[in-house]
UniProtKB/Swiss-Prot annotation:
Pfam family, one: RNase_HII
Subcellular location: Cytoplasm
Protein name listed in UniProt: Ribonuclease HII
Alphabetical list of CDD domains matching this protein: RNase_HII_bacteria_HII_like
GO cellular component: cytoplasm; ribonuclease H2 complex
Name of encoding gene: rnhB
Cofactor note (record): Manganese or magnesium. Binds 1 divalent metal ion per monomer in the absence of substrate. May bind a second metal ion after substrate binding.
One GO BP: mismatch repair
Top-level taxon of origin: Bacteria
Length: 191
């Protein structure tokens, strides 16, 4: 009898002004779920950056499989954030070593590009460890990329706000202009 597999799926960076949107996909068995919960896994927004970073190696080690997908700022501008987010999620799912029978998606974004079973779950990170794990992987991967970009674009203070529309970031955009990694469609009211 074939084992039924579900992949948790979540996105990070959807509302940022800078950089790509990331998505994580994770398949966990019951034992891995319990182990991650015992290690403190929960909604990535409720974890410190250090705790998230400490969970990443464990998630990668004990998950059945995991993957990250992303869509660039250019894709976001060309496709819109909804379609770009969906592409990032589909990319993550397609990169999984094993294709799941069902997707458990945090939020309410049905994937039009996925022809299999899917379930959207509001506050899914609180209900499904696989979604929480996907969120942690995506958040840490995106934050790491943005911190590297902060070295290239130090005038924007990216290490402080990871690309979100804080007053500091908006002021820097007004002063220095946009980079090729800024989402032009998100900046219409700033410049």
């Amino acid at each position: 009898m074939k084992a039924y597999t579900a992949a948790g799926l979540d996105e990070v960076g959807r509302g940022a002004l800078f950089g790509p949107v990331f998505a994580g996909a994770v398949i966990l068995d019951n034992q891995a779920e319990d182990q991650l919960i015992d290690a403190g896994l929960k909604d990535s927004k409720k974890l410190s950056a250090l705790k998230r970073s400490n969970l990443v190696p464990l998630i990668k080690k004990i998950s059945h499989c995991w993957a990250i997908g992303q869509s660039s700022a250019r894709e976001i501008d060309l496709l819109g954030i909804r379609n770009a987010t969906e592409k990032a999620m589909i990319r993550a799912v397609h990169r999984l070593e094993k294709q799941p029978d069902v997707l458990l998606i945090d939020g309410c974004l049905n994937l039009r590009l996925w022809h299999g079973e899917q379930k959207t779950v509001i506050k899914g990170e609180d209900l499904y460890p696989s979604i929480a794990a996907a969120s942690v992987l995506a958040k840490v991967a995106r934050d790491d990329l943005i911190k590297r970009m902060a070295e290239k674009y130090p005038q924007y203070g990216l290490e402080k706000h990871v690309g979100y529309g804080t007053a500091l970031h908006r002021a820097a955009i007004s002063k220095f202009g946009k980079t090729k990694l800024h989402r032009k469609t998100f900046l219409s009211k700033i410049q």
